[in-house]
Amino acid sequence: MAQASMDLGILQETKCTDGIHTRALAGYSVVATDMPIRHRDGVAVYYRSSPNFAVEAVRQFGPNVVDFQLATGARRWYIIGCYLASDDTSTIESVVAAIKDQPQGAALLVAGDLNTTLTEPENDQRGTDIAAALTAEGLADMATHFLPRRRTWRTCSMVREGKVVRSRTDYILGTDCRLF
């Protein structure tokens, strides 16, 4: 992280159990969720102090959800990091609860691995429920507002039971693309 000059990030599938993880190293602070099942899921946020921003109120909001506030000059962001496993149907409820806990005056961002394609849910109830829940909260994919000249992200694609299944798993969702 330091070699890449990254001051802040959200990690997914951290697989931390029993509260065992690095909490501080090389100037970084790390807050990770504690998973009840070993070697499965989890998210973490890492950050170091910067003159350009301050990270405040980092907390765990369920086993696969962390949230924090990011103050950058006159603007304040409420950021939710999440990981929704492909067989998980309950974490979206924690994400929605965290969204409803948004502080007044803070712009909302949700960053995470949703294991579904929001624009084309895979004809399964899970994908449809996730897309509906996030759309109901007024969230939209920020990547569609910043189209590159060429495709720069990868999607997973496979044939399962004679049907092509595609997924773009990582998203940054927000309520107002004009803030970027």
Task: Set out the residue ranges of the language-model regions.
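A shared catalytic/ligand-binding motif for oxyanion handling
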Residues: 1-180
